[in-house]
């Protein structure tokens, strides 16, 4: 241990700032003894001295209060602050009045002199901090948590009750000090036992390593009595503002915080006798972790043990290791504060986790559902670049000021409701090697280095270069068959092994050596690509590439494919059903082009082999569902077969095998959610939203006319036909759709919770107005970039609170007509909710510019299905009255097509739809 520093007065000419720097330099290794200023030579504005806590010494600066005096209480608070940061496991929380201060006086016989008033402290003194004998052991055990709302990107569990934290974002609370996670409902029950491991600093590292000197002032004690009164000041530099002065609290200064249970309750509980737990076998209805080893309690029932008194949960194997610290049933104001109090209670509507069962399917894709879209939407605040950086700062949610002007609703994101699927790397080489072939146009057998990936077969000149002879796209391969006798084989030449047929040429691949001159050594495959073994491996590899999504373990026959014998093709266009048609002979599926995934399958990109037309192919694995749900798998196909509308995605055909269903649809550009999230502000302007919503409503009107309710309407299921700023949109994904009559109700579980009406969430009967609620949510998320409801509150209560639903940011920029339409769509009572035609007639959608944009779209696609001829004269008259320009080509179109039989037929059909819906 080094000798204590020599205390000596500095030179009288030493400036005040230099004296502070010299005092700070005393803690730097190798800087020699610490020079102290002469007593009474206080720098302007405060007294500079050192605080000694055990073996740690810190320079501090005591500032004057507004009355010009010094306060001893501020010195005690400063000492507690140093202990909290350097020794968080021994925090002095609330012990300001139990700290004694002693001044080192080498000239006195008793070196330590008790400091009774602040004036006893002189410039350059060394003050020893001693804990009074009146401090009890319980005082050291009480360390409150710093709880802040946190968004988790992976499933997490409450460290108090052990149950999973449910929800999409802001699922629970995280302590800044110890990093533990809790339910919001558990906040009042959490014991004040924070360990502070996340913000712990090595006790042998001085806080002055940051180049700062601690200061204390009485100016802030009234506003924040429990905060450390610290203001870092760099020697020789200007002092920072008080708002930047709280080290260790810089990150969450503006975030919504929660407080734990009262400290008086902890003192009361510490006086209770701790006894062994009384464990009994328990069955849990929700995912729960062992509160001893923090691992999941696995199983369907009787997963673990629970204490009858305090509800502590653990594994059977962990029970002997649990300490005897049961406090029994602890209640305050009639409420049970034990850890697992709600572990076997079914939650009611309006509680924090009332979506737990409904959202269970969402947890499989929590990492995918909250990727960069969510990070960008949440990053609205700024993190202070303070010295004590949180090691988990990249996973903290950004600072969000809680005020009436800011929306705290869930940010808009892509909600995935399927089993997690990872996207394969594009252009992955599936097989490569030397191979020989000749064609129907050239009988000369050639040898190339073949490389097979997910989209093509490339014939390279050699195995290292990039120059290639030919590329055979897999989408152009019409047939893969074993070798047949051919007249093209030269006399005396060896026959080929298999054939690849395209529209223009047939490739005869491989060479079957009938009479080999010498067998290859050790039965190894010849490197030249000759022989039946190497050809057989290539045939199997190409067959798998042509049908990349066949079930694992299925055999691929070289002759008659096993799928061809049992597959069925249903053509939607002409209602023809063909037996023994394999989808791989008609379409090429690209396994690395995943367009999306839904409740019942994955959607891949594909191509028609003969025409080269791009398609989207949804592949449904029937083995994932019970037999009784197979009818639901075909529900989408059955509905789309009867739908032919420009606003609904076109279904081409369907293939079915015992294991899978292949639904082939037209391929579009993207979806509406991608358009919203990629926009400049993360939300759409009103004129674009009107344009898209009108098209959605027209498609819905056609569905409702046929008594079809979509039941899962959301931006992900609204596809864009092009990348234009004003694109055509089409509805897709009818897996949840239902046939519901005009006055009928259904009760089956449907849809995505974030877009579902309250009657579905409450398991009540619903009708076609369910889709209109979803339209209201789509309008809301399009204009604001957030979901309209917070998961913590009852939907009905939130709707009644206009300040909550429509905070000034961003709703002050949005018209009152849009808000009025949203209010009429988000009606909890179904009979008050707007219908399709009433929504289309709303003033917000009856907009001249929107009508012009829709007419231009109809002119581009060559079909009029959104607007009606009867409105032409009205809008033309409106343009004349308002002095607006009416496009001349629209006048000519209405004059030329107004009297045609086709126009009359379309008009009568549209009129009948409106009358039927009304």
UniProtKB/Swiss-Prot annotation:
A cellular component term from Gene Ontology for this protein is: cytoplasm
Which positions does UniProt annotate for ATP binding? 595-603, 618
Q: Sorted alphabetically, which CDD domains does this protein's record hold?
A: C1_PKD1_rpt1, C1_PKD1_rpt2, PH_PKD, STKc_PKD
Pfam family name, one = C1_1
**How is this protein activated or inhibited?**
Activated by DAG and phorbol esters. Phorbol-ester/DAG-type domain 1 binds DAG with high affinity and appears to play the dominant role in mediating translocation to the cell membrane and trans-Golgi network. Phorbol-ester/DAG-type domain 2 binds phorbol ester with higher affinity. Autophosphorylation of Ser-748 and phosphorylation of Ser-744 by PKC relieves auto-inhibition by the PH domain. Phosphorylation on Tyr-469 by the SRC-ABL1 pathway in response to oxidative stress, is also required for activation. Activated by DAPK1 under oxidative stress.
Q: What keywords are assigned to this protein?
A: Angiogenesis, Apoptosis, ATP-binding, Cell membrane, Cytoplasm, Differentiation, Golgi apparatus, Immunity, Inflammatory response, Innate immunity, Kinase, Magnesium, Membrane, Metal-binding, Neurogenesis, Nucleotide-binding, Phosphoprotein, Repeat, Serine/threonine-protein kinase, Transferase, Zinc, Zinc-finger
Q: Where are the zinc fingers (Phorbol-ester/DAG-type)?
A: 144-194, 276-326
UniProt KW Zinc-finger keyword: yes
For the modification Phosphotyrosine, the affected residues are 93, 438, 469, 508, 755
Which SMART domains does the record match to this protein? C1, PH, S_TKc
Q: Catalytic positions?
A: 712 (proton acceptor)
Cofactor(s) listed = Mg(2+)
- Composition-biased stretches, type Acidic residues, lie in 345-355, 387-396
Q: What is catalyzed by this enzyme?
A: L-seryl-[protein] + ATP = O-phospho-L-seryl-[protein] + ADP + H(+); L-threonyl-[protein] + ATP = O-phospho-L-threonyl-[protein] + ADP + H(+)
Q: Where is this region: Disordered?
A: 338-362, 380-408
The residue ranges of the PH domain are 428-547
Share the record's PTM remark: Phosphorylated at Ser-403 and Ser-407 by MAPK13 during regulation of insulin secretion in pancreatic beta cells. Phosphorylated by DAPK1. Phosphorylated at Tyr-93 and by ABL at Tyr-469, which primes the kinase in response to oxidative stress, and promotes a second step activating phosphorylation at Ser-744/Ser-748 by PKRD. Phosphorylated on Ser-916 upon S.enterica infection in macrophages.
The entry sums up its family as follows: Belongs to the protein kinase superfamily. CAMK Ser/Thr protein kinase family. PKD subfamily.
Q: What is this protein's record name?
A: Serine/threonine-protein kinase D1
């Amino acid at each position: 241990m080094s000798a204590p520093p020599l205390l000596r007065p500095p030179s009288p000419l030493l400036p005040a700032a230099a004296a502070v720097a010299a005092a700070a330099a005393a803690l730097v290794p190798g800087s020699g003894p610490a020079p102290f200023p002469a007593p009474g030579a206080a720098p302007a504005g405060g007294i500079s001295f050192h605080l000694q806590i055990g073996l740690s010494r810190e320079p501090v600066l005591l500032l004057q209060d507004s009355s010009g005096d010094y306060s001893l209480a501020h010195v005690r608070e400063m000492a507690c602050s140093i202990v909290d940061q350097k020794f968080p496991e021994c925090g002095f929380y609330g012990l300001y009045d139990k700290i004694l201060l002693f001044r080192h006086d080498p000239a006195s016989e008793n070196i330590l002199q008790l400091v009774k008033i602040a004036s006893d402290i002189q410039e350059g003194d060394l003050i020893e901090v001693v804990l009074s004998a009146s401090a009890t052991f319980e005082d050291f055990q009480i360390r409150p948590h710093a709880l802040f709302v946190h968004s988790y990107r992976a499933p997490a569990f409450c460290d108090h009750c052990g149950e999973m934290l449910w929800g999409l974002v802001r699922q629970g609370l995280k302590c800044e000090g110890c990093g533990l996670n809790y339910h919001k409902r558990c906040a009042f029950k959490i014991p004040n036992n924070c360990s502070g491991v996340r913000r712990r600093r090595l006790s042998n590292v001085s806080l002055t390593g940051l180049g700062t000197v601690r200061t204390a002032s009485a100016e802030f004690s009234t506003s924040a009595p429990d905060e450390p009164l610290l203001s870092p000041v760099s020697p020789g530099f200007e002092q920072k503002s008080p708002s930047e002065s709280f080290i260790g609290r810089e990150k969450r200064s503006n975030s919504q915080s929660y407080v734990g249970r009262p400290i008086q309750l902890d003192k009361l509980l510490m006086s209770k006798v701790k006894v062994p737990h009384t464990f009994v076998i328990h069955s849990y209805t929700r995912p729960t972790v062992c509160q001893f080893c923090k691992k999941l309690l696995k199983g369907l029932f009787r997963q673990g043990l629970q204490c009858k008194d305090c509800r502590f949960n653990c594994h059977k194997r962990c029970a002997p290791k649990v300490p005897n610290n049961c406090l029994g049933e602890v209640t305050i104001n009639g409420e049970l504060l034990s850890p697992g109090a709600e572990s076997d209670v079914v939650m009611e509507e309006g509680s924090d986790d009332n979506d737990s069962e409904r959202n269970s399917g969402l947890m499989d894709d929590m990492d995918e559902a909250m990727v960069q879209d969510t990070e960008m939407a949440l990053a609205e605040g700024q993190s202070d670049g303070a010295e004590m950086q949180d090691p988990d700062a990249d996973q903290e949610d950004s600072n969000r000021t809680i005020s009436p002007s800011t929306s705290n609703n869930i940010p808009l994101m892509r909600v995935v409701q399927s089993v997690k699927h990872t996207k394969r790397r594009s252009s992955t080489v599936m097989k490569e090697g030397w191979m020989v072939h000749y064609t129907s146009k050239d009988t000369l057998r050639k040898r190339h280095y073949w490389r097979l990936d997910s989209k093509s077969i490339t014939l390279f000149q050699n195995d290292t270069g990039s120059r290639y002879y030919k590329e055979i796209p897999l989408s152009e391969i019409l047939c893969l068959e074993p070798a047949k006798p051919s007249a093209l084989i030269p006399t005396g030449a060896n026959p080929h092994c298999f054939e690849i047929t395209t529209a223009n040429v047939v490739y005869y691949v491989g060479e079957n050596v009938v009479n080999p001159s010498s067998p290859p050594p050790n039965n190894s495959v010849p490197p030249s690509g000759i022989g039946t073994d190497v050809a057989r491996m290539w045939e199997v590899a190409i067959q798998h590439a042509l049908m990349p999504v066949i079930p694992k373990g299925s055999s691929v026959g070289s002759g008659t494919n096993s799928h061809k014998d049992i597959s069925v093709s249903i053509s939607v266009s002409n209602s023809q059903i063909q037996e023994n048609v394999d989808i791989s002979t008609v379409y090429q599926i690209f396994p690395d082009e995943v367009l999306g995934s839904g409740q019942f399958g994955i959607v891949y990109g594909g191509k028609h082999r003969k025409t080269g037309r791009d398609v989207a192919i949804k592949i449904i694995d029937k083995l994932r569902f019970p037999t009784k749900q197979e009818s639901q798998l075909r529900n989408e196909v059955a509905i789309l077969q009867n739908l032919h509308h420009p606003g609904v995605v076109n279904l081409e055909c369907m293939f079915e095998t015992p294991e899978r269903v292949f639904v082939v649809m037209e391929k579009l550009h993207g979806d509406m959610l991608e358009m919203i999230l990629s926009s400049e502000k993360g939300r759409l302007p009103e004129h674009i939203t009107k344009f898209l919503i009108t098209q959605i409503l027209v498609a819905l009107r056609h569905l409702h006319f046929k008594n079809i309710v979509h039941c899962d309407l959301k931006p992900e299921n609204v596809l864009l036909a092009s990348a234009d700023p004003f694109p055509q949109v089409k509805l897709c994904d009818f897996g949840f759709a239902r046939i519901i009559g005009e006055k009928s109700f259904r009760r089956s579980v449907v849809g995505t919770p974030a877009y579902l009406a309250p009657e579905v969430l409450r398991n009540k009967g619903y009708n076609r107005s369910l889709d209109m609620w979803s339209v209201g949510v789509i309008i809301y998320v399009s204009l604001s970039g957030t979901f309209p409801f917070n998961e913590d509150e009852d939907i009905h209560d939130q709707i009644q609170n206009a300040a909550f639903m429509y905070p000034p940011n961003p709703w002050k920029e949005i018209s009152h007509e849009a808000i009025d339409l949203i209010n009429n769509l988000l009606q909890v009572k179904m009979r008050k909710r707007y219908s399709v035609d009433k929504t289309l007639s709303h003033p917000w959608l009856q907009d001249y510019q929107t009508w012009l944009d829709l007419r231009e779209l109809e002119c581009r696609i060559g079909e009029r299905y959104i607007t009606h001829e009867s409105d032409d004269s009205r809008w033309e008259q409106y343009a004349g009255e308002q002095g607006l320009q009416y496009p001349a080509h629209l006048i000519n179109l209405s004059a030329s097509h107004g009297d045609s039989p086709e126009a009359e037929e379309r008009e009568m059909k549209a009129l009948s739809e409106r009358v039927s819906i009304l």
